[in-house]
Amino acid sequence: MLKRKKIKPITLGDVTIIDDGKLRKAITAASLGNAMEWFDFGVYGFVAYALGKVFFPGADPSVQMIAALATFSVPFLIRPLGGLFFGMLGDKYGRQKILAITIVIMSISTFCIGLIPSYATIGIWAPILLLLCKMAQGFSVGGEYTGASIFVAEYSPDRKRGFMGSWLDFGSIAGFVLGAGVVVLISTIVGEENFLEWGWRIPFFIALPLGIIGLYLRHALEETPAFQQHVDKLEQGDREGLQDGPKVSFKEIATKHWRSLLSCIGLVIATNVTYYMLLTYMPSYLSHNLHYSEDHGVLIIIAIMIGMLFVQPVMGLLSDRFGRRPFVIMGSIALFALAIPAFILINSNVIGLIFAGLLMLAVILNCFTGVMASTLPAMFPTHIRYSALAAAFNISVLIAGLTPTLAAWLVESSQDLMMPAYYLMVIAVIGLITGISMKETANRPLKGATPAASDIQEAKEILGEHYDNIEQKIDDIDQEIAELQVKRSRLVQQHPRIDE
């Protein structure tokens, strides 16, 4: 007979009360690192035309644009390796230490892009050095977003995880706005000729002081409550093992959590393809294909992104009330239905209609980004959360990162300006399947962690809800038993009379 593990009833002392001050510091530090990651993406996306001329001067404009965007996409090949590396270390040594390392690598590699001489100076080594810097970024970013989202999720109260997690992608959008704004400002001040000569380097130099600030904030943070609980549960022998070797079983991840892996991959693909299409490819699309000036296209995207900043936390707040799944499903349906109308407006050559088309895509994107950072960490238990999420996330981003290059190639090869819309419709189907099949995670404790609350009163309410849920399950079981008793009685009455 199997021995069942004795289960202790949960008490008020088992509920983790989250310190507001520590929570604010965690969100600030995590969001700043994410902002710096997307600052680079924003800068790179908006100076792609300049980089094409600096590093690929012999090609025609279309090839220059595709080559520059390809350099943006290639580092995504290295991100899964970074995700696996930092994911294992994050589950082994903790989240805080890894986030300090990733921001250092990211800021230094971004800064170094600004130091690379042009093709005219060092020839083929210029694009090679650019690619190496981008690959270093890709390696560090492989552990950045997943680590930051886990850090915020493990610090957040269960009832506010959606709202708190939404600030992570608020940082992404803010970083993008800052990067794009810096490009426009410098380009306007120094003029296009000077910008191509040396002005494009300045935005990359800004990454270093941002990285120093981020490192200071992250270094001062404490480890997350959920990971600390995991360590505290280990016996001394296991504690030593945690320091000496990884406790991550990729067999367990692949066999026991494959549904969560697929849900994670689907959600990240839907979110990031839309993200890169709108925020990285659209500036090039507007300038190269629709012949708007670079500054004009950038200003439209910046205005859209500023609007997204206000919508982002609202989506997170609403997801705490209505759940994460409705937003994924609603966003996917809207993306499928509105992709073609949005691009018809974008191709109208009327500034107001262009803005309306981009705004439609932006609101749809907010449906995904508002819930992603709170949804993904809740799919996996504490002891494998970083490794599993980093692996799934970066495999997905590997696909999504090809979006700018693939979209540019599709438009150039087909001469059909609606190709990006068709691409988004395919992605919308993936998002819809994911939203329908994924489990709801809102207002529930993270797997492998005790409930988390903002204060004692909320902790008592959580215990009350837990009690009511158990009572409801008991009632359901009693009902099932009663129905089985009725079925049993009917079967007994149907016994054939073999003694007559």
Swiss-Prot record:
> Which cellular compartments is it found in?
Cell inner membrane
Cytoplasmic-side stretches of the chain, per the record, are 1-37, 87-97, 143-169, 216-260, 319-325, 372-390, 438-500
Cross-referenced CDD domains: MFS_ProP
- Enumerate the UniProt keywords alphabetically: Cell inner membrane, Cell membrane, Coiled coil, Membrane, Symport, Transmembrane, Transmembrane helix, Transport
Bilayer disposition of the protein = Multi-pass membrane protein
Residue ranges the record marks as coiled coil: 453-498
State the Pfam families in the record: Osmo_CC (PF08946), Sugar_tr (PF00083)
What does UniProt give as the signal peptide span? none
Span-the-membrane segments of this chain are 38-58, 66-86, 98-118, 122-142, 170-190, 195-215, 261-281, 298-318, 326-346, 351-371, 391-411, 417-437
GO MF, one example: symporter activity
Periplasmic side, ranges: 59-65, 119-121, 191-194, 282-297, 347-350, 412-416
* Any one GO cellular component localisation term in the record: plasma membrane
Superkingdom of origin organism: Bacteria
Alphabetical list of Gene3D superfamilies matching this protein: MFS general substrate transporter like domains
> What is the first-listed, main subcellular location in coarse terms?
membrane
User: Which PROSITE patterns does this one have?
Assistant: MFS, SUGAR_TRANSPORT_1
Function according to Swiss-Prot or TrEMBL: Proton symporter that senses osmotic shifts and responds by importing osmolytes such as proline, glycine betaine, stachydrine, pipecolic acid, ectoine and taurine. It is both an osmosensor and an osmoregulator which is available to participate early in the bacterial osmoregulatory response.
Family membership noted in the UniProt record: Belongs to the major facilitator superfamily. Metabolite:H+ Symporter (MHS) family (TC 2.A.1.6) family.
Protein name per Swiss-Prot or TrEMBL:
Proline/betaine transporter
Q: Which organism is it from?
A: Salmonella typhimurium (strain LT2 / SGSC1412 / ATCC 700720)
Instruction: From the UniProt record, report the name of the gene that encodes this protein.
Output: proP
